[in-house]
Regions:
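Short basic (Lys/Arg) and small-residue
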Residues: 1-141
């Protein structure tokens, strides 16, 4: 739902990147709270009811992918997405690192393909490399 709010704010009819940036920040805080409280030891209260466990990759993809895609033409959105992914990756590497790296690269690809002026494209690339290069040498550049 939060990604939908951010995407709606980025639509041409609304064109409100400030709301999308606010939603990205809130999403990062929610995912951080989830990571802080995540436990492998779960008390089963209702053994007859089965609920599939949350997948960390899905949590990040469901939130960040649509926002990065719909905000591809706005440098402030791309930068905020990269910073949010970096915070989650560095704050909880065992939970979010792999998905955050993959989504950061996807965000960079969206930015490169978007119609940015050269200085914006260089800024986004620079931020990506500053935040994500060196963390995991097996990831795409």
């Amino acid at each position: 739902v939060m990604a939908e709010i951010a995407c709606r704010a980025l639509s041409p009819a609304v064109n409100d990147p400030g709301t999308a940036i606010d939603v990205i920040g809130r999403g990062v805080r929610i995912l951080s709270t989830y990571a802080q409280n995540k436990s492998d030891e779960i008390e089963v209260k209702y053994p007859s009811v089965h609920v599939a466990p949350l997948q960390n990759n899905d949590l990040l993809e469901d939130f960040f992918s649509p926002v990065a895609r719909d905000g591809a033409g706005m440098r402030e959105i791309q930068i905020r997405v990269l910073k949010g992914l970096s915070m989650l990756s560095k704050g909880w590497p065992g939970i979010f690192s792999e998905a955050a790296h993959n989504l950061a690269f996807e965000t960079l690809e969206h930015a490169i393909r978007a119609d940015h002026i050269d200085s914006d494209r260089c800024l986004i690339k620079s931020i990506y490399y500053n935040l994500f290069s060196g963390e995991d040498s097996n990831k795409k550049p």
